[in-house]
Swiss-Prot record:
Protein's UniProt keywords contain Ribonucleoprotein: yes
Entry GO CC: cytosolic large ribosomal subunit
Gene Ontology molecular functions: structural constituent of ribosome
Keyword Nucleotidyltransferase: no
BP terms from Gene Ontology: translation
Family of the protein in this entry: Belongs to the bacterial ribosomal protein bL35 family.
Protein name (Swiss-Prot/TrEMBL): Large ribosomal subunit protein bL35
Gene: rpmI
Length: 64
């Protein structure tokens, strides 16, 4: 039986770390003039995938 393919969209969005998976925040690509500076600052950087979603991400990336 052939190997299962990873979901390429998920592979672009999530990275495996020692503590789980990291991802970038949404709503930070365009039409940012309406958004306050505070909101844009809060959306900077990466965050961890919520523990309830880790199993889904692992299944999409074929981790385990």
């Amino acid at each position: 039986m052939p190997k299962m393919k990873t979901k390429s969209g998920a592979a672009k969005r999530f990275k495996k770390t020692a503590n789980g998976f990291k991802h970038k925040h949404a709503f930070k690509s365009h039409i940012l003039t309406k958004m306050t500076t505070k909101r844009k600052r809060q959306l900077r950087g990466c965050s961890q995938v919520h523990p309830s979603d880790v199993a889904k991400v692992e299944r999409m990336l074929r981790v385990r």
